[in-house]
Structures are given as structure tokens and as C-alpha cells.
From Swiss-Prot:
Family, similarity comment: Belongs to the Nudix hydrolase family.
Record domain Nudix hydrolase: where: 196-323
pH dependence statement: Optimum pH is 7.8-8.2.
Protein name: NAD(P)H pyrophosphatase NUDT13, mitochondrial
InterPro entries: NADH_PPase-like_N, NudC-like_C, NUDIX_hydrolase-like_dom_sf, NUDIX_hydrolase_CS, NUDIX_hydrolase_dom, Znr_NADH_PPase
Pfam families, per the entry: NUDIX, NUDIX-like, Zn_ribbon_NUD
Keywords annotated in UniProt: Hydrolase, Magnesium, Manganese, Metal-binding, Mitochondrion, NAD, NADP, Transit peptide
Subcellular location: Mitochondrion
Listed cofactors: Mg(2+); Mn(2+)
Enzyme category, top tier: hydrolase
Length: 352
């Protein structure tokens, strides 16, 4: 009976989608592609593909912006044929989303090698010439992409990187096998199933009411300051991580921790950024910077932060000798934490 029900509802599923909201329809369609190998292979035939080479996405310059080209199945097969490869290479692709019309989106890296395949890496420069684009470091291109494209490429790169790093079973040492959608890997020997994961990271904007605390690492561009951030330790809650990280990095105790938002961040590896606001205990605002963690940390006034938010320009450009305060770009959740604090403080000032 259960087998009959599963078969019946699978046949009816596409018709039922029309009765649901667009979001629910997409979510259930993607779920089906992840669970049904046959359905996913069928979707590959009508889907589109985003190309990578050694985790660098294929991009095309358009003025000061980058466009993200995508290939149809026929175009991809034609490209592979020119480089002596057949359509089996498409099995290495991973599902990264779909359109409202249920056009499936896949990402395929033509530079990475698979432990379970003898397929070779394709020549980067020759492919760039053939495709009329360039394989560019995603972090380098970040500020020239729109938010929709950057989010999709974040997901694609993170998933491709995860598969590249989990080609062998940690228990048996044997090669693992990817399902068609790329939503998991399975070890045929140990039967262990591996799922893509993100490391939880708490990012916290600390305030004393009138000022906010920002810090920088030596690797940051000149003048750039951001909110405090750190990985969650095993066994910790989000609140415990906030308390510990602030204490470790700047020697302060915080209270009134409030969750704000979250964001997937692919650099250097996939992290789930959990954004919070917190305040220091009254009368305890003296910063003691942990130089093993940070290069500097300081309190900044509302006026200073407001001015920095209004400042235009790319972080790729070096600031002047005056080193004005630079803040994370709009794409980063730290920017939204800081902006939210400014908006809240500005409203409080007006009300007063």
C-alpha cells in the first residue's frame, strides 16, 4: 500500500505544484530532484549549467560589472565534445536551484578531478577562448556581481568545494559516490551518508548605547573595520559563543544579546553567519585587545559610522593616507548589522 501511495503521489506531484505558492512549488520540486535520481537526470536535459574551473566561476565582463553566463545541455555537450569528452562529464554537476518555471540550475567544475572518475581537467585558457569569458576568483569579482548572481555562485562554489573535499570515506578510506543532484555522498563500503555542512559562526555588533565596537584583522584592507566574529565551539549555544568570543577578543562582558539575521558565507569555507547585537555592562567599556586574534579594536561614534556608511567606493581601492573608516560591503551581513544599529540609534536620537 505504501509503495502504491508513493508511486501515485509522485505521478501527481507536478500537477499538485500548481495549487501551491511559488515558493512552496520550488521547494518541493527541488526536494524531488534531490530524492529522485531519474527525475534529476531528466531535469538535467532541460536545465542550464553554470561553469567553474578549479572553483573559479565563468564570468563575462560588461562595463564595470560581471555577467554570469550559463549553458544549455546542448551547448555544454558541444563544448565537452570539442575537448574530447562525452556527456558523462555532466554527472559531475550539482543542483543549485531552479526558476519559477521549474528550469533546474546546475553547476559543473571542469577543472577539478574526481576520485571516482578518470576524466581529466579541461584546459582553462582554451575554454575561456571558446566561451568568451574568464574563470575569475569569486572573492575578487564579488563587488562587480549583483546580489542574485552572487548568492547563486556562493551556493555553487560551496557545494563544489564540499564535494571535492569529501571524495573519500573518513571511516573506510574508500571513494564515496555523489548522488545525481549532489545533495549527498555515500560510501558503498561503510554505507555512511555524508551531507554538505556549514560551520556556524557568530558575528556580533557590540554597543555601549552611544557607540559601537568595531575591530580589524591584519589581513583586512587598509582602514576596514567590522563586527566581532568567531566559530561556535562544540556544545555551545549561540549566546554562549557571543559571550566567549567578545571576552576572548576584546576583554568585555556583554548582555542583552539579540539575534538579527543569518547568511551563508563561502569564504574560505562554508559558514553560517549568525548575526547578533549585544551591549556591554554599564561602566565596563575598556577594551583589552587580544593581539593573537585582532590587529585593533575601537569604539566608534554614531557620526563616524554614519559617515562611513555613506562613503562610496570599492574595498579593492586603497584608501588615502588619512585612512578613513571603511565598513564591510552591502553584500556582507556585517554591513547590515552596522546599518541596523545606525538606524536604531538615529531614531532614538530623534525621539529624544
Amino acid at each position: 500500500m505504501s509503495l502504491y501511495c508513493r508511486t501515485f503521489f509522485r505521478r501527481k506531484s507536478f500537477g499538485c505544484y500548481r495549487l501551491l505558492s511559488t515558493y512552496v512549488t520550488k521547494a518541493r520540486y527541488l526536494f524531488e530532484l534531490k530524492e529522485d535520481e531519474e527525475a534529476c537526470r531528466k531535469a538535467q536535459k532541460t536545465g542550464v549549467f553554470y561553469l567553474f574551473h578549479d572553483l573559479d566561476p565563468l564570468l563575462q565582463a560588461s562595463g564595470h560589472r560581471y555577467l554570469v553566463p550559463r549553458l544549455s545541455r546542448a551547448e555544454l555537450e558541444g563544448l565537452l565534445g570539442k575537448f574530447g569528452q562525452d556527456s558523462q562529464r555532466i554527472e559531475d554537476s550539482v543542483l543549485v536551484g531552479c526558476s519559477e518555471q521549474q528550469e533546474a540550475w546546475f553547476a559543473l567544475d571542469l577543472g577539478l578531478k574526481s576520485a571516482s572518475s578518470s576524466r581529466a581537467s579541461l584546459p582553462k585558457s582554451e575554454m575561456e577562448a571558446e566561451l568568451g569569458g574568464s574563470f575569475i576568483k569569486l572573492r575578487q569579482a564579488l563587488f562587480q556581481l549583483n546580489s542574485v548572481d552572487s548568492s547563486l555562485l556562493f551556493t555553487a562554489q560551496a557545494l563544489l568545494r564540499w564535494h571535492d573535499g569529501h571524495q573519500f570515506c573518513s571511516k573506510s578510506g574508500q571513494p564515496t559516490q555523489k548522488n545525481v543532484a549532489g545533495s549527498k555522498r555515500v560510501c558503498p563500503s561503510s554505507k555512511i551518508i555524508y551531507y554538505p555542512q556549514m560551520a556556524p559562526v557568530v558575528i556580533t555588533l557590540v554597543s555601549d548605547g552611544a557607540r559601537c565596537l568595531l575591530a580589524r584583522q591584519s589581513s583586512f584592507p587598509k582602514g576596514l573595520y567590522s563586527a566581532l566574529a568567531g566559530f561556535c565551539d562544540i556544545g555551545e549555544s549561540v549566546e554562549e559563543t557571543v559571550h566567549r568570543e567578545v571576552a576572548e577578543e576584546v576583554g568585555l562582558e556583554v548582555e542583552n544579546i539579540q539575534y538579527s539575521a543569518s547568511q551563508h558565507w563561502p569564504f574560505p569555507n562554508s559558514s553560517l553567519m549568525i548575526a547578533c547585537h549585544a551591549t556591554v555592562k554599564p561602566g565596563h567599556t575598556e577594551i583589552q585587545v587580544n593581539l593573537k586574534e585582532l590587529e585593533a579594536a575601537a569604539w566608534f561614534s554614531l557620526d563616524e559610522v554614519t559617515t562611513a556608511l555613506r562613503r562610496k567606493g570599492s574595498l579593492a581601492l586603497q584608501p588615502s593616507e588619512a585612512s578613513p573608516l571603511l565598513l564591510p560591503p552591502k553584500l556582507a551581513i556585517a554591513h547590515h548589522l552596522i546599518k541596523k544599529w545606525v538606524e536604531t540609534r538615529s531614531c532614538s536620537s530623534l525621539a529624544a
